[in-house]
Amino acid sequence: MSSNQQPVVLGKLGSCHGIKGWLKITAYTDSVEGIFDYSPWLIKENGEWREVKVIQWRYQGKAVVAELEGVTTRERAQMLTNCEIGILPEQMNALPEDEFYWRDLIGCEVINTNGYNMGVVDQIVETGSNDVLLVKANAKDSFGKVERMLPFVPGQFILKVDIQGKQILVDWDPDF
């Protein structure tokens, strides 16, 4: 892996399952089995990312467990508990033009239709009805805001997203 590529974190390894090195998997993907659509995985062990292959996986009650290449004992599996699971950015599926990965929206500057810089997207929250951008306001915000919450509703509040330019144009009152 080249040093300038930051892996996309998709989950983490949980506790051991059994004596043969299987591990529980916590997936951050939409569906828990979605994490297995990607191969190979990168595992962050002792601060270093390394490639690992999933040999097999299965449901175990309400959990999902996996057997990883080179992990054949409970002791070795215990060493991997809580390690992050990632993939290279180019392994991500291409999206239609009007869809975006959250990771690409975080760090974007948010500008309203009057040209007011509302701040930078710090987080995104899934609410059920629509995603919400948590925008960290600039230090000298004219409206005294520290953070703004903007619904991510394209065509209504979100007018344009420029991932390359790291900018989002919104129809939103900065006083909200």
Swiss-Prot record:
Name of the gene this protein is made from: rimM
Molecular function GO labels: ribosome binding
Record HAMAP family: Ribosome_mat_RimM (MF_00014)
UniProt source species: Shewanella sp. (strain MR-4)
Protein name: Ribosome maturation factor RimM
Residues annotated as domain PRC barrel: 97-176
Keywords: Chaperone, Cytoplasm, Ribosome biogenesis, rRNA processing
Family according to the record: Belongs to the RimM family.
Domain statement: The PRC barrel domain binds ribosomal protein uS19.
Pfam families found in the cross-reference section: PRC (PF05239), RimM (PF01782)
Record has Chaperone as a keyword: yes
Record's function text: An accessory protein needed during the final step in the assembly of 30S ribosomal subunit, possibly for assembly of the head region. Essential for efficient processing of 16S rRNA. May be needed both before and after RbfA during the maturation of 16S rRNA. It has affinity for free ribosomal 30S subunits but not for 70S ribosomes.
PANTHER family per the UniProt record, alphabetical: RIBOSOME MATURATION FACTOR RIMM (PTHR33692:SF1)
CC annotations in GO: cytoplasm; ribosome
Quaternary data: Binds ribosomal protein uS19.
Domain of life: Bacteria
InterPro entries for this protein: PRC-brl_dom, PRC_barrel-like_sf, RimM, RimM_N, RimM_N_sf, Transl_B-barrel_sf
GO biological process: ribosomal small subunit biogenesis; rRNA processing
Protein's cellular compartments: Cytoplasm
Main location: cytoplasm
Keyword Chaperone attached: yes
